[in-house]
Amino acid sequence: MTLEEVRKQIDVVDKQIKSLFKERMILADQVARVKAESEDAIYKPDREEAIITKLTGDVDDSIKKEYTALIKRIMEVSRKYQYGRTLELRNCLNVSFVTEEPKVKKLAMLKHELYICQGYSRDLVNTVSDYEQVMELIRKDEVDAGMGIFEDISYGVSDSLHEALAMNDLYIYRCDEVLDEGHRKKVVTFGKQLVVLPEHNRLKIVFVCKNKSGSLASVLSMISDYGVNLTEIHSVPFRGGEWNYRFYIELNGNLLQKEIQALVFQLINETETFKILGSYYCEQ
């Protein structure tokens, strides 16, 4: 058999796969409708593992890993579709935000970062020694917002500010870039409410993956499936019973977009912990 003949047979098989895939997605839509009504969970890892074990039981070892990967991928695509349909059928995204940027009269920031304060009178800025004190002033309503250097583009991110935002109910709503002695730095403003404006093009999130093989790859593949670009990613180890990592990701998108809402909905349901750290506009 020639290569051309083999390719023709592959084309026939691909058309059959396409037809079966379309049929399967019709069924996935029916599943989404039922689960939206019953509020049943879309992702059931134990059930998926049982199905994979059953389907791969009679598959030759030489192609078992490849078939397993295919089945997992089909399940991932089906779940993605179901999350989007569920939001269309039932408004169940539990994320509260406002659509107007708050007015800021008083700020809190680190004393050694006071030089990056722009647009505010310095006599209205409360300077402290660490970010926990900044967070405390905001919580007590003694200031309207906090400000800090989020990232030195030449060197890296501020782990302390990332961690402070991750551990508190505070959100970035503005990001400005300043030039300091030849170094470009991202300076963020953050407050009590998640603010989402139409012009925002960045969404900052933090999550912890489920502690199993391939979990991070699955999340990154999920984000890619929504056609969303990552503009920054880094991890920070922490001890929560056993060692794990918090992953901080900046997405190119806006929470007002349906696709981004579906992605967030899926991440909430398929990661160990998840939090939005902010929504803002960024030129870079």
Where are these regions (language model features)?
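Domain-level signature for soluble enzymes in the chorismate/prephenate branch of the shikimate pathway
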Residues: 1-284
